[in-house]
Amino acid sequence: MMKNILAIQSHVVYGHAGNSAVEFPMRRLGANVWPLNTVQFSNHTQYGKWTGCVMPPSHLTEIVQGIAAIDKLHTCDAVLSGYLGSAEQGEHILGIVRQVKAANPQAKYFCDPVMGHPEKGCIVAPGVAEFHVRHGLPASDIIAPNLVELEILCEHPVNNVEEAVLAARELIAQGPQIVLVKHLAQAGYSRDRFEMLLVTADEAWHISRPLVDFGMRQPVGVGDVTSGLLLVKLLQGATLQEALEHVTAAVYEIMVTTKAMQEYELQVVAAQDRIAKPEHYFSATKL
């Protein structure tokens, strides 16, 4: 059965970030994506200038009411949320999650708690970080913080892999069953590798891949794609190890393709075949 995912996050007209980054790769893995945009911008904000608007929170709820009105909400297998334009949007998204789960009790909520980036500093509206700590975290089934976001969610520093596993389990005690630490940064084993953790109450998997050097400007949307692809693989029945290994390789293929084409925006279309069947392989290790 094809899985249906309601993806609620940012959208850019030019380039790839949020839904504009994840829709195509998720579809390429065989999922139906229902994109619902929290913001519509001309381009992502790392360019330093952009136009567009943040959607009113009520807009999100109205769109989902429309899907419910045609009796299709029960076919939704998961809600994925990413970049929020405001904390109030987050409250509406939790209402949507409750509505989807009422229609399909098996549905999952995957929260990508976008609050900041180790190299870019915090880039979200006031109240969004607090929303994730107080409301997004306990409501989620799967949550995917980077290192900075993990520290904000668990409210203490995380200095190494062992502490990251313990911090992930602190989050699990508050609601989610699965935590993806989608960028270990300086808490990883090695400074010259990109490392991730996938943690449950009784399992912890670590994986690393080479860093891809883009110089001063790192492409935007890598975390968005990582979260979206992981959700698809888990919904399709992959084990934690299989999901983590495929996602790591697929994202690496996108990065390598983007660099080879000397582009700044993620080249998800050019890399599409390698997203579905990566040519590289990285082995996850059980901790």
Swiss-Prot record:
**What GO MF annotations does this protein's record show?**
ATP binding; magnesium ion binding; pyridoxal kinase activity
An example GO CC term for this entry is: cytosol
Xref: NCBIfam families: PRK05756.1, pyridox_kin
Q: Where, in this chain's numbering, is substrate bound? A: 10, 45-46, 224
Q: What is this protein called?
A: Pyridoxal kinase PdxY
Where on the tree of life does the source sit, at the highest rank?
Bacteria
The organism's taxonomy opens as: Bacteria, Pseudomonadati, Pseudomonadota, Gammaproteobacteria, Enterobacterales
User: What is the purpose of this protein?
Assistant: Pyridoxal kinase involved in the salvage pathway of pyridoxal 5'-phosphate (PLP). Catalyzes the phosphorylation of pyridoxal to PLP.
Q: Under which EC number(s) is this enzyme classified?
A: 2.7.1.35
Spell out the HAMAP family in the cross-references.
PdxY (MF_01639)
Leading EC class: transferase
Q: Which cofactor does it need?
A: Mg(2+)
Gene that codes for this? pdxY
